[in-house]
Amino acid sequence: MVAALLPFGYPTAMTTALEARNIVKQYPGVLAVDGASFSVREGICFGLLGPNGAGKTTTVEIIEGVTKATSGEVYYYGEIAADKFRQEAGVQFQNTALQDYITVRETIEMFRSLYERQADFDEIVEQCSLGDLLDRDNRKLSGGQRQRLLLAVALVNRPRLIFLDEPTTGLDPQARRNFWDLVQNIRAGGSTILLTTHYMDEAQVLCDEIAIMDAGKIIAQGSPDELLQKQYDGLIIELPISDLTDDLSGIEHTLYENLGIIEVVTTDVSESLKRLAPHVSNLNQIKIRQPNLEDLFLDLTGHSLRT
């Protein structure tokens, strides 16, 4: 099923599908994108992470050709992105206006008609789990159903490269997870995906590689595991600041403060707990966990991923 939608074969691990080089976007009084550079290997799901206002949507719109860069270049398989790129890219915009009084079926057919190379209608419907909704008006769709329709619209031209801009914003937890399943199926078929998100859990589930963006700059790029291993050596012990009986300045560990929580990074949990115990009023509030992308973003930028 997926292979019929994505007829380009399986990717080679080292092929670069997309590259952004020194992208700059200057608005009057605002530098929205400040020399952003990153590359996306063929066949992976690549996540561009950042809080609202980081510049990630502007960067992606420049790559898509929706917004013109002040300077910088976008390359698609080693060539300046041009007609071939536009024919082979599928875009699910964060905010796409759909006509209210036409059906799901009519919407898919309308967008298919815009392309010479068209995906099979039935395969798109099956891929996006829209079979029971074909005769429903767009205005009657739930948030999750609407996002599945927008994904179907992004697949109508059998894209080799798919852009998903904040695709699960506003969805309930179950709808988000259902959408993740759809994205993973598309990724398994060999397509390259560029995903923007400010959800840490979404990036950890879906992305093979990520770039972290803040204040218009790319500040880190790599696989989630690589970046976490580079930043952290050990586990994190969490305890509420309100449970401290005195300060921890004498404790020789890496300490972070985040939303009323002290986080201690340590390679020796037992020893750290032994040192912390005399300073804590309620030991039952202590938690031990693995570092995650939210921690990484906070440490690199000084603020939360969802700020």
For the regions a protein language model found, what residue spans apply to each?
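Generic structural signal for individual residues within well-ordered alpha-helical segments
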Residues: 108, 122-125, 177, 228, ...
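ABC transporter nucleotide-binding domain
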Residues: 181-267
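Short, charged/small-residue-rich alpha-helical element at the C-terminal edge
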Residues: 233-307
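ABC-family P-loop ATPase nucleotide-binding domain
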Residues: 2-24, 303-307
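ABC transporter nucleotide-binding domains
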Residues: 17-18, 25-195, 200-214, 220
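A generic structural signal for secondary-structure junctions
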Residues: 77, 90, 116, 229-233, ...
